[in-house]
Amino acid sequence: MKTIRLLLLSFCIILSIPYVGAQSSEVPSGVISALDDGNANQLSGFLNGNVELVIGNQNDVFSKQQATGIIADFFRKNRVNSFQLLHKGNKDAASFAIGTLKTTSGSYRVYVLTRKNEIQQLRIELSND
């Protein structure tokens, strides 16, 4: 009887390992929260040392400090009303989130790509909706 219990417990542990790995590779909830609040300082805590940024006419790879300034400027000019997460997923070590950012000046499509809980790419583009 102990052998059966031990085998069953081992089987359950082995099955749960892929689930734990998938959980850890999602876009951090703090990123979603920072977008919803329009908080560039909170978002900067998740930026990689260099991040590909597409916001307005800014389209390049920027240092964390430069990217934080550009994001803060965007949030100053476009006060955030809400952020709605539309889709998220992951593959290998990367994860992504796609959503709609509603601001006082219009709606924007947001795409976030992360690796190891750090934002590698952030795109905020005017939505056609």
What are the roles of these predicted feature ranges?
Residues 1-26:
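Bacterial Sec-dependent N-terminal signal peptides
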Residues 24-39:
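Short, aromatic-enriched amphipathic alpha-helices that serve as compact interaction elements
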Residues 26, 47-82:
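Short solvent-exposed beta->alpha transition segments
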Residues 42-43:
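Solenoid-repeat scaffolds in large eukaryotic assemblies
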Residues 54, 100-102, 127:
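A generic structural motif
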Residues 56-58, 103-104, 115:
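Short, flexible beta-strand-to-coil junctions
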Residues 69-107:
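Surface-exposed, charged secondary-structure patches
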Residues 107-129:
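Short beta-strand edge/turn micro-motifs at domain boundaries
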